[in-house]
Amino acid sequence: MTKHYPKLLLLILTTAFCACKQPSGQSSTALADYLKDSSAIPRTGGIQMIKINTPKGKFNIWTKKIGNNPKIKLLLLNGGPGCTHEYFECMESFLPAEGIEMIYYDQLGCGNSDNPKDTSMWELPRFVEEVEQVRQALKLDSTNFYLLGHSWGGILAMEYALKYQKNLKGLIISNMMSSCPDYGKYGEEVLAKQFDPKVLARIREIEAKKDFDNPEYMQLLMPNFYAKHICRFPVDQWPEPVNRSLGKLNHSLYVTMQGPSEFGIGGNLTNWDRKAQLKNITVPALSIGAQYDTMDPKHMQWMATQFKNGSYLYCPNGSHMAMYDDQLMYMNGLIKFIKGVDAGEKSVKL
């Protein structure tokens, strides 16, 4: 038997080496299927432009698919309102290795999509119908459609679920409370009190004069608010995808819906509140909260108790961009939730 030992050892080592090269949980066949692009020629690297109908005419919406999984398709709704899909790019370092198909989507007025430059179109009900038209064009349905909304995207995702949850398999609300008045209250009663009193007084003075274009306003907010509650890195070390997305912010869209102040909401979302309707969301739903967020993590935890099949993910080191500043907690929890729902779980312990 000894004369066959070198060949046997070589076979074992070769097999082990090949096995180690595969991403977690994926065989070579599964990986090939995930990476395969069967779209029509000429192929565009997963990009699909979708023409939507609106009360003001037809417009083009930009989407990009990464990967291929007929059972798990995650559509990403960016925040702002008015940011772009780009700050979600960190997910490419985690989700493809788990076989999760992810779909970027720039909402109307954002990024690579058309910008009608018409403030009358920045209304929540119209955005809900836009998401539904995008879903139809991408052929997503209740067997595979997971919807993740972050910040403003969370408002949009909740509204979509309340009207169209029959099309969903799973819902993820990331870093967004279910009430804008409660969000404003948290900002005033909790976050504002964490400021240096002199800094806060100067910010209040600028806001009272509605002098939001004053460079001093952002100079005060960046180190005292953004670096503590939006993304917990020194501002000069913020991740490039975050800077790129914020650099393309549609200010008209942002101010119309959010308002010019960073403390609470003063635009047409001011009175938005869906606390009483959360119980009507019956699909598996995950809420994600973070300790240092602009959103109250206790409210996010409460939301999970209101959904019929709710789960909660807490990011103890995270802020509003917890997918960056508490990245492993965020990504591992998100993946565990999606895979749990795919396996038939209604709520997932995280």
Tell me the role of every PLM-derived stretch.
Residues 171-212:
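Flexible "cap/lid" loop of the alpha/beta hydrolase fold
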Residues 194, 201-279, 283:
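Alpha/beta-hydrolase
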Residues 37-60:
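N-terminal cap/lid segment of alpha/beta-hydrolase-fold proteins
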Residues 59-60, 64-115:
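Conserved HGGG/HGGXW glycine-rich cap/lid loop of the alpha/beta-hydrolase fold
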Residues 275-317:
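Conserved loop-alpha-helix segment in the C-terminal half of the alpha/beta-hydrolase fold
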Residues 143-186:
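Conserved hydrolase catalytic core segment
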Residues 104-148, 152:
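Active-site loop/oxyanion-hole signature of alpha/beta-hydrolase fold enzymes
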Residues 310-350:
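Catalytic active-site module of serine/aspartate enzymes centered on a nucleophile-bearing elbow/loop
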